[in-house]
UniProtKB/Swiss-Prot annotation:
Gene coding for it: fabZ
Superkingdom of this protein's organism: Bacteria
Subcellular location: Cytoplasm
Protein name as catalogued: 3-hydroxyacyl-[acyl-carrier-protein] dehydratase FabZ
Record GO terms (molecular function): (3R)-hydroxyacyl-[acyl-carrier-protein] dehydratase activity
EC class of the enzyme, as a word: lyase
UniProt-listed Enzyme Commission number(s): 4.2.1.59
Organism for this UniProt entry: Pseudothermotoga lettingae (strain ATCC BAA-301 / DSM 14385 / NBRC 107922 / TMO)
Catalytic activity: a (3R)-hydroxyacyl-[ACP] = a (2E)-enoyl-[ACP] + H2O
Record-linked NCBIfam families: fabZ, PRK00006.1
Amino acid sequence: MNIDEIKQILPHRFPMLLVDRIVEKSEDHAKAIKNVTASEIFFLGHFPAYPIYPGVLIIEGLAQTAGLMLLNRGESVIPVFAGIDNARFKSEVRPGDVLEYEVWLKERKLGMAKVEAIAKVQGKIVATATLLVGVRKNEK
């Protein structure tokens, strides 16, 4: 799934659209990538002398990947980030890195989904979390 297809599902736009491409997708699993560039707006303040991609944005990218796993084009709902448990950050993400997001659906009921999530760079885990993602009606 390319960026144009992603934009048909997610409401996010620059600078908060944090998934560049979905490389695998099924009903209970998805893999995505985010190319971290030196021109990311977040590096203006985090941190200019030694830029590190903010951990909160890694988690948001994982949540967006979960939303893309759960939803399809043309649905009149949007994903909403409802909760996070057990978030752990294990390594820095720097300009030039390719973030690999991977999510697995563990439970789905009452419009909510519990998702296990891992972010990697070059196969090395940089973050893990359990996410709660809901859906709400899109009122365009």
